[in-house]
Amino acid sequence: MYFLSGWPKRLLCAPRSPAEAPLHVQSDPRRAFFAVLAPARLSIWYSRPSVLIVTYKEPAKSSTQFGSYKQAEWRPDSTMIAVSTANGYILFFHITSSRGDKYLYEPVYPKGSPQMKGIPHFKEEHCAPALNLEMKKILDLQAPIMSLQSVLEDLLVATSDGLLHLIHWEGMTNGRKAINLSTVPFSVDLQSSRVGSFLGFADVHIKDMEYCATLDGFAVVFNDGKVGFITPVSSRFTAEQLHGVWPQDVIDGTCVAVNNKYRLMAFGCASGCVQVYTIDNTTGAMLLSHKLELTAKQYPDIWNKTGAVKLIRWSPDNSAVIVTWEYGGLSLWSVFGAQLICTLGGDFAYRSDGTKKDPLKINSMSWGAEGYHLWVISGLGSQHTQIETDLRSTVKEPSILLFQFIKSVLTVNPCMSNQEQVLLQGEDRLYLNCGEASQAQNPKYSSARAERMPRHEKSPFADGGLEAPGLSTLLGHRHWHVVQISSTYLESNWPIRFSAIDKLGQNIAVAGKFGFAHYSLLTKKWKLFGNITQEQNMIVTGGLAWWDDFMVLACYNLSDCQEELRIYLRTSNLDNAFAHVTKAPMETLLLSVFRDMVVVFRADCSICLYSIERKSDGSNTTASVQVLQEVSMSRYIPHPFLVVSVTLTSVSTENGISLKMPQQARDAESIMLNLAGQLIMMQRDRSGPQIREKDSHPNQRKLLPFCPPVVLAQSVENVWTTCRANKQKRHLLEALWLSCGGAGMKVWLPLFPRDHRKPHSFLSQRIMLPFHINIYPLAVLFEDALVLGAVNDTLLYDSLYTRSSAREQLEVLFPFCVVERTSQIYLHHILRQLLVRNLGEQALLLAQSCAALPYFPHVLELMLHEVLEEEATSREPIPDPLLPTVAKFITEFPLFLQTVVHCARKTEYALWNYLFAAVGNPKDLFEECLMAQDLDTAASYLIILQNMEVPAVSRQHATLLFNTALEQGKWDLCRHMIRFLKAIGSGESETPPSTPTSQEPSSSGGFEFFRNRSISLSQSAENVPPGKFGLQKTLSMPTGPSGKRWSKDSECAENMYIDMMLWRHARRLLEEVRLKDLGCFAAQLGFELISWLCKERTRAARVDNFVVALKRLHKDFLWPLPIIPASSISSPFKNGKCRAVGEQMLKSQSADPFITPEMDAGISNIQRSQSWLSNIGPTHRDTDRASSPGPQMQDAFLSPLSNKGDECSIGSATDLTESSSVVDGDWTMVDENFSTLSLTQSELEHISMELASKGPHKSQVQLRYLLHIFMEAGCLDWCVVIGLILRESSVVSQLLGIAQSSEMDGEMLQNIKSGLQAVDRWASTDCPGYKPFLNIIKPQLQKLSEITEELVQPDTFQPVTVGKTPEQTSPRAEENRGSCSHGSISQSEPGSNNVVSRKEEDTTQADEEEPLQDGAYDCSVS
């Protein structure tokens, strides 16, 4: 449709006196010239360029006689202008060219420029002509002239004495008498008796009138406010032959404008609304079609303060109407009442500082060529508001403004390829939506489709230039792809009249005054006619369309005076030699393409179907056209100009199931004709004998005749249908989509029986469903259930002009207008309409076919929300509520629980009871979420329960959710649940918490330990670091002053309740040997792990089975079991050849079976200083830097492996850089030694095997921290298990030191001893890789055994089972409460002990380099 663009322009015509101020503008029939009236002046302006050509100035003496000029009317051939004056005179001016071939303005080109050579009519078209104005005739009608209208070769004039004068353009009445309106009979319709009521008042006269050619009559407004339509009942224009009809409910008419294409009469009223009437074809009565009025909802401040409607003007293509009011303002509407623009609100009405502007007052306006410009005579400021004195400047004086518009190509060229793309055309540029529709909506579909496409057909936005990653391409941003029309073509062919885009959105064709040109988005180039004479000899009359690589256009050949249908190939030169030309008997008005058929509508009201076929003749590719069928529509179409669009479709009243052959469902089943807003369908007559199609060629077969037309809908502006087929989405692809202006949209939907059962004969097979949308539709994405459109947006720049003198600038008075893309989902409207009509089965089939759309959950939510809002807020009881039906419908989908709770969260609390009465008890829905493991949705239901139930119920359900979240490791949710439980206990549960984010927490894999990291859950949540706990939506919790009101008793009780749940979970994790989960749990929730382990040292924190624990840790931390290298028997490390290298390479392992005791002692000393304590200092940062991929480069040593099937082939030499914990100094040693030593294959193999026996670097960091934690807590048996995995002999040495220096529990030492013995037995039988390390620590084990025998009596060597008492009865929960209630959360400062965060960059690569356990376990650590 029409959209404002940029700022308006002001033409330079500053009046020197009030007599020179412009007051009226009127365009000629071709809209190339504009007559501008001042009180004593007549000026002629040219449209492009917008320049003044000639001015006639009335002498003072005659000006006093005639009075000031009032109105102007052009003769149809633009050779004369009639001007009415205030004293009842009509002045006839002749327009003549001055002195032959002279031009007022000529473009100057350099010599030899191609523009000067051989362009026919170049000067006429491209130069402003020099004209003369000469007054030829003066006619005195002796009464003030109210209106004058050009009717064919006559001028119809209405005067204030109630007379109608029919005057010839030469200024003569030809003896015809004036008609007295009081003698014209009026009635409500033409079927009433011939003698109707008369006006009957002597002072009644016509105030405004306009002739309607397609209705053959005049729409009139009388001075008493009544409106009517006067039509001659025969060809003679006399009082006896005129009859009038009027609507009885309009008494405040002010002005009128007529739409010839849609046969509409728009009457402006004093109330500020516009009433649009049409004529009933059968009775002749005036029927109200629709109203154009501002609503209080959209414009609460101004809707009833606009004053009377002052002017109404229909656009040149009759698809839009512009309205202005007495107190100022401008509004633009589509033909059937969809509002497009209004300047009484938003940035048009308010400055950036919030102050109100005076609305623009308009005295006169007229549309320019093709509707690209609106010429406006602006008046003085608003009359009913105080005018600021400093604004009395030139802008407040009457001036000529040019508003610029861009419009949809559907207004003039509604061919099918234009219906699936949004294409707007401006005066010199085109706007199209980026990307292919199907590709942008469905990336998977688009990629598959792109693979099937030939290379030359792929969209430029799919590969190469611009990318279409998904929905964002078509919907996610507001920008257009702007194509500048070739200036060479525009120079001689302005204005652009038609545009068309192909189905893939790659090629665009435009047609102006002569010829046409096309543009490729792939090559970014225009292609024009090489022979300019061929271009200038062709006028495109009926539009143009794309068929594959061909342009199909209907044109008039000027040289042969012949109507033609031409087809040009895109890839060949633009020349008539490569065109296929078919002569046509009559002028073609409309053209469209359906599959391999072309349908044209001609001026004789006939429709002709052509078949089009590609033909290859050697290197030349052409297309041939054959006539298939002609259909005469003259019986049904009163005037050919009334046809808005003609379309071939496969749509019929019977859906594809009931047709006799499947081919018929894809054929051109019917013709859709938009006749002045009435959608008429003619489908093929299949009642008679069918034609066999087996043997006949499809282009030569005889086609079935068409049935008589059937009216499908009224007030139709645009029609969308597709020729594609998709079995999964038949409802959407076989439907017919209609745009009905202010009434919204309609869809003619097919109804299919379930499972292809035979349909019932008494059931309709299609249904028309109306629905409202908030945008003006320009394209329908059938498979994606989306409507695309465009909307005007505004940008204020008045803040840039601060000087008072600059406040008169147009940039200050008007905002800058831009056009933005927009879209809307319509699926929920259709589903609702089907449910209203008890067609739930059809609604379910339709919804299931669209369930894969990414916004389908939003569709269900929208439907539920709209029905809930309407029914729950209704003032009157609803006899048959729809909400239960909608609720039952949504339960058919797995998204039911999310849909309900999201709808509730976006709805007022007062409506919840009504909602849950229909969908079910929120407690039951919460439990369903828990059963389905949908914890985020359950958390949302918890907020509902908090507001609808007592705190005890909320606590019960919150506890269930908390325990489940703990088990699943949803740490963000756990944190929110802790706060939520505290809020309930604090008595502040009235505050409705908000939903946690539904996304997966990013920190679910890792844990962060700090040196003093224990966090007391007894503290308030204000201390929680915002970076760690802050989310977009959080469960609410009292903060600030309200937190101080908590009683200490309730705080202690709540904290105890929460701590008991945390202790229980930690105990379960430890008993199930889930150390990694325990570490994540403690780090994420700030659990006091060390203090808790101290209490559980001899109970839950005791290792019962060392072998099982060892296996589980290997599995959880992706740590490979140790292996014995194949070449270990002849290892180079037995001699001292590689002693330096060996020392450095084995620092991190210190457990090689061939290391001497002296080496072992040295290495253990290094390890003791670099184990966990160094990991949290600067040294470990260096380790990270060395072992993580960084800017510094390190060598990777590769060696061929001797036995590919052997277990040792798992190791990779690249593990050296990914998994090793060698520090920077060690790398220097390695590089130096390896550069000087020549290692054999067996030596490299040995190093590789050693590296292969280590796990990921991150796992190593985590295990060392856990080792540190257990050591601090005194859980020495767990220390031994972790030390075994890391093969740290220093752990056993430390254990010995502790056992010797302090009194240790004998049971623990005995447990360690028996556990190590069990590991030794397991290693002997199942894992010999552990044997070398066990041999290394054998002396320490022997010493440990001696200490054990000293501490423990012989009778205590029996197996001991430690009882695990439940925490409910254990005094442990209370005995150390004081120690658990202090501490603070450590902020993650730059210098703090947060190591894991520094290691994050290594995560991916370290894990990828562990092929042993690849894909077996999840090791995502944040």
From Swiss-Prot:
Residues 1403-1412 have a biased composition (Acidic residues). Residues 1378-1396 have a biased composition (Polar residues). Signal peptide: none annotated. The keyword Cytoplasm applies. The modification Phosphothreonine is found at T991, T995. Gene3D superfamilies: YVTN repeat-like/Quinoprotein amine dehydrogenase. Its main location: cytoplasm. One of its GO terms (cellular component) is Ric1-Rgp1 guanyl-nucleotide exchange factor complex. Pfam families: Beta-prop_RIC1_2nd, RIC1. Expressed in the eye lens. PANTHER family: GUANINE NUCLEOTIDE EXCHANGE FACTOR SUBUNIT RIC1 (PTHR22746:SF10), RAB6A-GEF COMPLEX PARTNER PROTEIN 1 (PTHR22746). Forms a complex with RGP1; the interaction enhances RAB6A GTPase activity. Interacts (via central domain) with RGP1. Interacts with RAB6A; the interaction is direct with a preference for RAB6A-GDP. Interacts (via C-terminus domain) with RAB33B; the interaction is direct with a preference for RAB33B-GTP. Interacts with GJA1. Belongs to the RIC1 family. This is Guanine nucleotide exchange factor subunit RIC1. It comes from Mus musculus.
